[in-house]
Amino acid sequence: MTQKTTLVLLALAVITIFALVCVLLAGRSGDGGRLSQPLHCPSVLPSVQPQTHPGQSQPFADLSPEELTAVMSFLIKHLGPGLVDAAQARPSDNCVFSVELQLPAKAAALAHLDRGGPPPVREALAIIFFGGQPKPNVSELVVGPLPHPSYMRDVTVERHGGPLPYYRRPVLTREYQDIQEMIFHRELPQASGLLHHCCFYKRQGHNLLKMTTAPRGLQSGDRATWFGIYYNLSGAGFYPHPIGLELLVDHKALDPALWTIQKVFYQGRYYESLTQLEDMFEAGLVNVVLVPDNGTGGSWSLKSSVPPGRAPPLQFHPEGPRFSVQGSQVRSSLWAFSFGLGAFSGPRIFDIRFQGERVAYEISVQEAIALYGGNSPASMSTCYMDGSFGIGKYSTPLTRGVDCPYLATYVDWHFLLESQTPKTLRDAFCVFEQNQGLPLRRHHSDFYSHYFGGVVETVLVVRSVATLLNYDYVWDMVFHSNGAIEVKFHATGYITSAFFFGAGEKFGNRVAEHTLGTVHTHNAHFKVDLDVAGLKNWAWAEDLAFVPMNVPWQPEFQMQRLQVTRKLLETEEEAAFPLGNATPRYLYLASNHSNKWGHRRGYRIQILSFAGKPLPQESPIEKAFTWGRYHLAVTQRKEEEPSSSSIYNQNDPWTPTVDFTDFISNETIAGEDLVAWVTAGFLHIPHAEDIPNTVTVGNGVGFFLRPYNFFDEDPSFYSPDSIYFRKDQDVTDCEVNSLACLSQTANCVPDLPAFSHGGFTYK
């Protein structure tokens, strides 16, 4: 290579480097040399200010802190000086257990919503424990009007047909604390030798804790609870770490000093008392299995053992959110509804409208139960009715980016439970629009004509999560762009376990050296008050039949022809479908108004559930959740039948306060305001993969409400998200295909709020 050639190449290299530097500098702004900031996505639609929602949502809004405070002040003033803060109340005290919204009568709400009448009077429902009265009882009082209450009325007899016995009351936190004191300071020291030998027990230590079961006894009037004793492992779930000790505590007496241990169970054998257990241990008559103080083996912490990797996918709104939330109301271009949280029953939505037309008045969770089996007394007798504990009460803050999309809208919930002052649960709800990564509908044609048409499936979701002891329930209300509503729940959290001994594998799977994951079922019940094109609806059942016939064009041959069967369900008995029996695959509520094609406008109820067989009716506790007998039941809507369950059923399942079978009285359901009651559930046999805790995958059930001839055609046909192009069109042209414009419309960086968490104690 000549010197001249070398100089030319060197000059070209210098020019190239100079050009690259110029390009890089062109990408810098005049802010001291930093790269120019990318365009940030708008937080609201540029052409739309935050919407002011109609005050019509107010009838269903949960009580505000100011309203809760006003009610409590009124109760303290009018119930006398003997009222004790529930956080400190003993069974012999009078206290306010809870205050929440008293839902308005439907007729009054509709007069306001539909005919411009005055809004219903806002009232509160207060539950009072009168332990200090000569005949202790539970009373329910309606207090109003809010926000300045001037009256209260006792509705106990009106709502329940008589007084509520005191033993039916839910257990206060203070009562659990007194039981804790009794067990760990009065009773366990009687077996300190055995417990030190098996479980590293220290009298002043905190390495053991208790876990409640329910129901509490074997007959009405009992208040005797089996408590399991577990290792307390800091930063990890204690639920899979039983030591094999279970205690039956009788806590019926109003004086905690009179509470007693009725029975003791230890690693497969029953004893009359802890003293007897200790004496037999000292005599060498107890075969003790040593349980390490770091638990029963396995990986129990939810802290990952690997460092964080690359960030997972993130959804954002390139042109701002397409929905808004104000107070309790959500509104999008398609949907509008109010949402709330019952302190005991859980999530609920009201006045649900699609394209401005109401399709349902109320969709709400009613109850959730977990029924267990096992070979220890605690596991074999457990049936948690979560409404008694409080599905709303035990809702948790939603963790941004895990429980909900990072950029979801988060909403607080205010409540007054076991306290004289309101508290706030931060981030109790999240609302978000989600691209499902799935076409709602599509077709690609290569026959005769060449085109593609489709629309992406985006949904609007309202979510809350309740942690009831070991299990976390994720509750979703999902709104689709074709007018369908999806209601579902997923179970996650820790499994409940028992000490593994004997024939334990009849009742589950061994998941650690000394731990049996106990078999159980999850079931939830839902109220669905559909108003399909009006209040007067009819229930229809459709399915298929194979009908033999001669082939018309060749009669010597036969064929089986598929045809639709239709039946009008005229009574509540006809419309009650027991679990395990055949249920019509198409069941829908319809009006007497027709669509363009002459069919009754309807909404179909499609259930996705694996509930299996219900608890046999011979069980003495089965009457407490007779709704569990039915896959689906349709009844007349009645104000005096607001809920299929009761918080009092848990502690007196033998004489339940609410028996759902009373709702099915064979009245007509033709042309009436109807409610569909839906059961969804599944069987869970815990297995190794439930360690460290249960995943949501495959552990979700629920139902759809789907338009059935409600429209003249699929309403998503008018979705602005639709895509259509033909073979002869340029699919890269933004005028033809809006997805081709994403490089412009979605070329922005979302504003990510700082990570926050609602905390572990209520404010």
UniProtKB/Swiss-Prot annotation:
The modification 2',4',5'-topaquinone is found at residue 471. Ca(2+) 1 binds at residues 529-531, 673-674. It is a single-pass type II membrane protein. Glycans are attached at residues 137, 232, 294, 581, 592, 666. Belongs to the copper/topaquinone oxidase family. Its EC number is 1.4.3.21. Residues 28-763 are extracellular. Ca(2+) 2 binds at residues 572, 641, 663, 667. It comes from Rattus norvegicus. The keyword Protein biosynthesis does not apply. It catalyses: methylamine + O2 + H2O = formaldehyde + H2O2 + NH4(+); benzylamine + O2 + H2O = benzaldehyde + H2O2 + NH4(+); 2-phenylethylamine + O2 + H2O = 2-phenylacetaldehyde + H2O2 + NH4(+). GO terms for molecular function: calcium ion binding; copper ion binding; identical protein binding; primary methylamine oxidase activity; protein heterodimerization activity; quinone binding. PROSITE patterns: COPPER_AMINE_OXID_1, COPPER_AMINE_OXID_2. This is Amine oxidase [copper-containing] 3. Topaquinone (TPQ) is generated by copper-dependent autoxidation of a specific tyrosyl residue. It holds the Pfam family Cu_amine_oxidN3. Residues 2-6 are cytoplasmic. Homodimer; disulfide-linked. Probably forms heterodimers with AOC2. Keywords: Calcium, Cell adhesion, Cell membrane, Copper, Disulfide bond, Glycoprotein, Membrane, Metal-binding, Oxidoreductase, Signal-anchor, TPQ, Transmembrane, Transmembrane helix. Gene3D superfamilies: 3.10.450.40, Copper amine oxidase, catalytic domain. Binds 1 copper ion per subunit. Binds 2 calcium ions per subunit. It is found in: Cell membrane. GO terms for cellular component: cell surface; cytoplasm; early endosome; endoplasmic reticulum; extracellular space; Golgi apparatus; membrane; microvillus.
